[in-house]
């Protein structure tokens, strides 16, 4: 009798756990659909709590993936000519300049792979007093999905590594060993969010 009761309780607990996992999976899928659909604002967050909306990204669902298109707000940037190149930059305690990825970008993401979106958000920073820009001072924002968008934390990259074409142009270059940890609070913009358009 006790053995049968124990078995029944175990089966019920197992069923409840499976149901919970299924619910979590469904919630994650819904979150992924919300994050990868529609128009979102690109917002840079400063270390002092202020925020600056610098553009939008439009996601278009395409089966299990989404295509995206970024439109920067040129009024938030100043044109700079640095190291024989033209950049769109944001001025402040440091100068943050957007660096377009110089090789083909399919602009497709999935809930599990946001690398091509991250590669459309590459930057280089410099001090206002510095002459020119050192491409070794590159930044990529490592994105994590939220319920309705993304949050990204800066990681250090050396943009000189893509001065020549990577061996595999079909794979986003700045992943894994090509990224380096940054101590929180060391950069002017400490995070980026991609959130529902206001």
Predicted regions and their residues:
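Positively charged n-region of N-terminal signal peptides that target proteins for export
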Residues: 1-4
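Bacterial N-terminal signal peptides
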Residues: 8-22
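A short, structured loop/turn motif at beta-sheet edges
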Residues: 32-34, 60-67, 88-95, 142-151, ...
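Tryptophan-anchored aromatic micro-motifs
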Residues: 32-55, 69-74, 95, 146-155
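Short, cysteine-centered beta-strand-loop-beta hairpins and adjacent loop/turn segments enriched
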Residues: 47-51, 77-81, 106, 158-169
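Predominantly extracellular/secreted and cell-surface proteins with exposed
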Residues: 64-133
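Edge beta-strand at a domain terminus
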Residues: 137-138, 147-198
